[in-house]
Amino acid sequence: IGKSSLKLKNNDAIECCFEPMPIDKAIIPEKLNLDIIYEDAHLAVINKPAGLVVHPGSGNYGGTLLNGLLYHFKTLSKGDSHRPGIVHRLDKDTSGVILIAKNDQSHEHLNKQFSNRLVKKEYIALVWGKLEEEGCVEHAIDRHPKNRKILTVVQNKGRNSLTYYKRVEYLAPLSMVNLYPKTGRKHQLRVHMKSIGHPIFNDSAYGGGAKYAKSFHIKYTQLINRLLKTIPRVALHARKIEILHPGSEQWMCFEAPLPLDLITALEILKSENS
């Protein structure tokens, strides 16, 4: 089929070619340098660096966070048989705090908290433009009709999603913002920021890549190019997560410090805006 707009007629013949399904591969423990924020008999909390895939998948059969977890920890929850210990995920380019369950009881306990929206999460991001001081985005999210690898806001279908935001500081041409997702949809924060005209910096999949710089005065060109080199990924960091501990039933808050690329970018922006 040469064009997606081509309409089929009766008796048309279609030849389909499918790639063979990958052979199920055992997940091999690998010695990775994990930044372990907290650990006890029930759970572990990791500060995931940007660029690290959470679990093996198509094209990523090794060097993932899960490979490192299997090496470092004697026990992990069974969870999904292919993702032991993994309670929730972060995108490859997103840095920050991620929870790991060390037994099935803890996994179930944490899963229920996510399902019941008890988990409190805070992200920090750099977004394009001057975002209003605070607000919320409430849009349903679904697969993009033309590009199935990304998501988009939709009407009358999709999955409901809600994000609160608060601008911390405007450092032209970007805003430093805190994001508080109340639902946990895939790419939620990235989709929501794009939907209100302030995509996350260097998020090319959602309109925030280098091309977005054309929206700004030429006086910002040199600064933007410098920032793109400083943060060669989506400028999004999972800074805090607050949960009921599955053993003690006490609230606990875990925080991942800002990574060097974001610290450096903020220093550059503050210097240029002083």
Task: Kindly label every feature range from the protein language model.
Residues 1-274:
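RNA pseudouridine synthases
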